[in-house]
Amino acid sequence: MIIHPQFDPVLISIGPLAVRWYALSYILGFILFTFLGRRRIAQGLSVFTKESLDDFLTWGILGVIFGGRLGYVLFYKFSDYLAHPLDIFKVWEGGMSFHGGFLGVVIAIWLFGRKHGIGFLKLMDTVAPLVPLGLASGRIGNFINGELWGRVTDINAFWAMGFPQARYEDLEAAAHNPLWAEWLQQYGMLPRHPSQLYQFALEGICLFAVVWLFSKKQRPTGQVASLFLGGYGIFRFIAEFARQPDDYLGLLTLGLSMGQWLSVPMIVLGIVGFVRFGMKKQH
């Protein structure tokens, strides 16, 4: 079993100011978005100009931050924040939702498109290939922080990783499983899936490769965005089987996690959109 290195979440600290790895992962994601966006402009495969790309980035950042935070509040810990509403503003304590951030970016795309006279689906198609590497960067941030770890796996599995940060969850899990209790007593922690790395590979690298390559040719309007939508939903749904469910939610109906249920509409809309838009002539 590999032991998580327990990286210091703070990269640089100068007096009261601290630069955290997780914040850096977001910044890297926005840099990658801009870099890929400029490549697409140079290839003639974008509705952006260099100036409008920089303008949209501001809209996108606001969509990610506000949507991600609001999504976390509504989807994951609504009752807690309802009891302590001021905690919503404590973003430094963590708590962001991809699905909320996605909805925030969709709203930003709609508003930006209206302002600049760009069709919503055309703009979605342009933005979609630029996003996955940013998601990959975010998952590396999760791994460095030692958060969002995976479910318990076999002690002899080559991928098994112990997370010292999961001490409380390990104790709770071992209390209901004699074999896990034995492992915990012997090794001091339980072997878990490094699910952050699975999500890095699936939602980040694989999704980027699929959407980027598919969008290198002109496609029917809406089809690239649909591929991203369905692709992310499928990869996230799969990865969630290895990810530890949120302790304050657990597994929901049919034994699925909140992340899986939120991904189901993405999968359905993505598949329907991909087929429907693909049947239309390119325009």
From Swiss-Prot:
Pathway: Protein modification; lipoprotein biosynthesis (diacylglyceryl transfer)
Keywords on record: Cell inner membrane, Cell membrane, Membrane, Transferase, Transmembrane, Transmembrane helix
Membrane-crossing segments per the record: 17-37, 56-76, 92-112, 117-137, 194-214, 222-242, 255-275
Keyword flag Membrane: yes
GO MF annotation terms: phosphatidylglycerol-prolipoprotein diacylglyceryl transferase activity
GO BP term, pick one: lipoprotein biosynthetic process
Xref: PROSITE patterns: LGT (PS01311)
Top-level taxon of origin: Bacteria
InterPro entries from the UniProt entry: Lgt
UniProt-annotated binding residues for a 1,2-diacyl-sn-glycero-3-phospho-(1'-sn-glycerol): R139
Main location: membrane
GO CC annotations, alphabetized: plasma membrane
Record-listed E.C. numbers: 2.5.1.145
HAMAP family linked: Lgt
Function: Catalyzes the transfer of the diacylglyceryl group from phosphatidylglycerol to the sulfhydryl group of the N-terminal cysteine of a prolipoprotein, the first step in the formation of mature lipoproteins.
Designated name of the protein: Phosphatidylglycerol--prolipoprotein diacylglyceryl transferase
Organism for this UniProt entry: Neisseria meningitidis serogroup C (strain 053442)
Source organism phylogeny: Bacteria, Pseudomonadati, Pseudomonadota, Betaproteobacteria, Neisseriales
Gene assigned in the entry: lgt
